[in-house]
A protein has these predicted regions:
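Short flexible/disordered coil segments
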Residues: 80, 112-117
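Mid-chain, well-packed structural core segment of small domains
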Residues: 62-75, 82
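Canonical phosphoinositide-binding patch of PH/PH-like domains
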Residues: 81-88
Length: 117
């Protein structure tokens, strides 16, 4: 049996709600593929963390389905993956995603919105 220990970080949404996330290496898989929320995050030279893309999914192992969004995440220097399982249902995941996007305005979420227009 192996045990993985991940650092924990709280991201605060525009509403003021704090959400607890676990920091994983990019490209990681999560046992069981639970539903949840995720952030692709860039760490700057100054150690500042900035979300590049924020999303939600039925399976945390299937985070980015769009090649354009994957290219945006890669091209904008994402260095970390922040995850947490969220079993409260799709609506709760969507609300958390929207709350965080409203606060942080990630560049690749803005690109996704423009593509949908």
């Amino acid at each position: 049996m192996s045990i993985c220990i991940h650092q924990v970080i709280e991201w605060t949404g525009k509403s003021g709600t704090a959400y607890r996330y676990y920091i994983w290496p990019r490209g990681s898989n999560v046992d069981g593929g639970p539903p949840g929320n995720f952030l692709h995050v860039k760490e700057t030279k100054d150690g500042i963390l900035a979300p590049v893309f924020i999303g939600q999914t039925e399976d945390l192992n299937r985070r980015l389905l769009s090649r354009d969004i994957q290219e945006c995440v890669d091209g904008n220097g994402a260095t970390q993956l922040h995850l947490h399982a969220n079993y409260k249902g799709e609506q709760a995941r969507i609300e958390e995603e929207a709350d965080l996007i409203a606060r942080w305005e990630p560049v690749c979420n803005a690109q996704e919105t423009k593509q949908g227009d």
